[in-house]
Amino acid sequence: MAGNVKKRPDGMWRARYRDATGKERARHFTRKADAERWLAAQETALARGDWVDPAKARVTVEEWSQVWLATKAHLRPRTREKYESALRVWVLPRWGRVALADITHADLVRWVAEIQVDRSPAHTRHTLIVMSQMLKLAVRDGRLTRNVADGVAKPRLTRPVQRFLSNDEVARLAAELPEPYDLLVVLLAFTGLRFGEAAGLQVGDVDLERGRVTVNWSISELSRGGLHRDAPKTYRRRAVPIPAFLVARLRAYVTGKPDDPPLFTARPGGTLRNSNFRPYFFAPAVERAGLAPLTPHNLRDTAASLAVASGANVKAVQRMLGHASASMTLDVYSGLFDAELDDVAERMNAAATEALGSWGAGGGSAAEGDAR
């Protein structure tokens, strides 16, 4: 039965139609034009096959956020904390009582602009991603016909400042640190381990015979002082080569120790935390060495730089750093490989100069002379 619009005794206009299951649906309007417009939209959606039960779309953002979070049980605790924080601080205060169907694209554009006033581009992007993922799930669940967050402009990110130390600068920094933290920073600078990966190392992860350190675990700091031990960031355990000079130092450091204890610990003991190591040991050493500003993550940058300078290709650097793909390595450290391309051209030039030198000087070819 086709839908229809009829005027009720109370003066309201009632629009009626039957959904895909044959159930009658109705809504009342004060104006006939609004009733006809709504009915036409429902019938069009039914014809396209993307009709949504209006009752399902009336669930609030707060209610739906719990459904969405339940689908994220696989997340690392630290990532889940970030999602929950975005919901608690930004999403729910603004949208918690709003029905999914009442959110508009324009509303989201204004909301993102408001967040940017107080928060960084990275934080704003993350908050928008949380909202967009919730709406995307609602579309897949048949509660919305489209994700109104699609097309909302994300703030442009600024890359963290990269800093590449020379071999001499690494030595200067290490000289300002007490044992074994001098060994720690040199290990970071020549293996590219993330700080959490270094904190997760056990003595048995160091293979002195092969000159490898195996990254099996990573330690993440949670809010309120919590810690979480998990597989490395890409969930891929990896063996990272260690330069011979560093193997010698590690041999002296681990000899006589059982395999199970952490390779590095806090003082006077316990798990090594970046939140303690950086302000109490690393930052003062950086100042004394005259290398400020510098962060522990810059030692990872340094490892990439030293590897490329030694002739390592992008695939080798990717495996060393534990990136998900070589394209990610190129994206993060494109400048390093630009310099490598210059070196390739110079080496090709040196190899070809003897054979093609006269041609390169403009000598031309016999065939070209005959043609003239």
Language-model segments: which ranges?
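Short, surface-exposed polybasic/aromatic micro-patch for ligand or macromolecular engagement
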Residues: A2-R58, K233
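N-terminal core-binding DNA-recognition domain of tyrosine site-specific recombinases/integrases
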Residues: D19, E24-T30, A57-E62, V67-V148, ...
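Major-groove DNA-contacting interfaces characterized by cationic-aromatic clusters
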Residues: D53-T60, A101, R146, L157, ...
